[in-house]
Amino acid sequence: MSVASVALSPALEELVNFPGIIGRFGFNLDDPILVFLTIAGSVIPKRVMESDSIASVKLRIQSIKGFFVKKQKLLYDGREVSRNDSQIRDYGLADGKLLHLVIRLSDLQAISVRTVDGKEFELVVERSRNVGYVKQQIASKEKELGIPRDHELTLDGEELDDQRLITDLCQNGDNVIHLLISKSAKVRAKPVGKDFEVFIEDVNHKHNVDGRRGKNISSEAKPKEFFVEPFIVNPEIKLPILLKELISSTLEGLEKGNGPIRSSDGSGGAYFMQDPSGHKYVSVFKPIDEEPMAVNNPHGQPVSVDGEGLKKGTQVGEGAIREVAAYILDYPMTGPRTFPHDQTGFAGVPPTTMVKCLHKDFNHPNGYSFSPENTKIGSLQMFVSNVGSCEDMGYRVFPVDQVHKISVLDIRLANADRHAGNILVSRDGKDGQMVLTPIDHGYCFPNKFEDCTFEWLYWPQAKEPYSSETLEYIKSLDPEKDIELLRFHGWEIPPSCTRVLRISTMLLKKGSAKGLTPFTIGSIMCRETLKEESVIEQIIHDAEAIVPTETTEDEFISTVSAIMDNRLDQYAWN
């Protein structure tokens, strides 16, 4: 998956403000907003009107240089501009303001490969893959070329390192990358007494090189250059076998030389961790210091000024623990998991845990060395094989029960970032049934409801009533036990976030008990427009207006409950 980071550097901001630059690009001072996009190394000015909708701006970006844009994120003033039906002015954009954007381009890249003897063939690979993967594909396609590690790939005369990402090679705007493959020189040693003689062989001829006295350095143990290990706050916690195996398989891949592959999708640093063969992904690692608007974010986003994340009510650097918390609270029908059990949760959140990890291929803007200060702490989530995400296909084919299980999770956790792109689609191996897997839960558990968004709200499945099994699961939920469970795992969830969790769970339980559909319950939680408060926000404000400031949390929640009952009765009668 490829992302073009569209962010303004300080140098570019000076360029925009430099006298005469406006006229040079053919714009007048009367133009309300100028947006400068950097895509594939080019700076492209675009005019944006205050009355333009967010959707129209995204459509305009799609036409730039013929790029096929699958997904875009627009950022302004540290906040994601996410509501397509809102206007530019709704987000406070005015004359002279600058937008930061992240867009996702087509996942696939065409590669033309030519051998030294003139043979040519083509490959199509994901942009998130690296050069080493391309070598493996070449070897499987052209058997006579031999072992992948014995070859060199060059681009414009430059030898490419195996860990180089394909997306990094797409800098000249060409639709096809042209590579040259040749056999690399082989080095072998022949013992001669206490010395050894070194031979270097290439495709056409051999050379003798003077040897040196000493041991063969290849037999010496290499110094440790990486590690992956659990990050556990509470020593009473014992990792289940599934999570231990997840960490172990991730480490085995690194030991075989298969380094992390940074995903070019999304606005934070996320790394695909490979298995020992290098052919499959086993996990996804998200360091806290590379989250959106964090200090080491690899996409060049501005650092958060007040600590708030892209979504209102979230904090930069807390995305990883929220990812883990979503897995912990997504327990099965039988209730919270107990050691050593590791059953799949009701909504199917992939197994996730906190780890410490060190590797040179993570983002180290100040340079890398094998030292404690370069250790990354973040979430490690099991990779789920899939055939795409929900944004890649029509939503009418999704099973009702699969959509409903995700709605339960999102309403309960007050998810501020549920879109079709973070719901994976796969097929059950037994009967081929479609399975939806929710991922990316770094914006759950906010301290306010302002940015709650559920894309499934507009799918027809959301207007179907919950099944008896789902209602039974919802009935069993207990926010107080959930809060204690999170604390046991080391997250001292802030009081403002626990309040939201209590109220969101209350809404889910009360609404479903009255026969309300996911659509109705979700509509109560989400805003219809950017500036119009949701029903749940109105209920909270009504409660705040009634109770005195020194009221206990239990008394406040009781007041919210009474007001909510009255509101929900109106929905039930309709």
Swiss-Prot record:
Domain PI3K/PI4K catalytic positions:
257-555
**Which GO cellular component terms are attached?**
nucleus; peroxisome
Q: Where is the Ubiquitin-like domain?
A: 32-109, 110-188
One annotated GO molecular function is: 1-phosphatidylinositol 4-kinase activity
* Residues annotated to bind ATP: 264-270, 286, 381-384, 440
Q: Where are the stretches annotated G-loop?
A: 263-269
Q: Name one GO biological process term.
A: regulation of flower development
State the source organism's domain of life: Eukaryota
Q: Mind telling me which InterPro entries this protein's record contains?
A: Kinase-like_dom_sf, P4KG1-8, PI3/4_kinase_cat_dom, Ubiquitin-like_dom, Ubiquitin-like_domsf
Q: Provide the alphabetized UniProt keywords.
A: ATP-binding, Kinase, Nucleotide-binding, Repeat, Transferase
EC assignment: 2.7.1.67
Q: What class of enzyme is it?
A: transferase
User: Could you tell me what reaction this enzyme catalyses?
Assistant: a 1,2-diacyl-sn-glycero-3-phospho-(1D-myo-inositol) + ATP = a 1,2-diacyl-sn-glycero-3-phospho-(1D-myo-inositol 4-phosphate) + ADP + H(+)
Q: What does this protein do?
A: The phosphorylation of phosphatidylinositol (PI) to PI4P is the first committed step in the generation of phosphatidylinositol 4,5-bisphosphate (PIP2), a precursor of the second messenger inositol 1,4,5-trisphosphate (InsP3).
Q: Which family does it belong to?
A: Belongs to the PI3/PI4-kinase family. Type II PI4K subfamily.
Protein name per the record: Phosphatidylinositol 4-kinase gamma 3
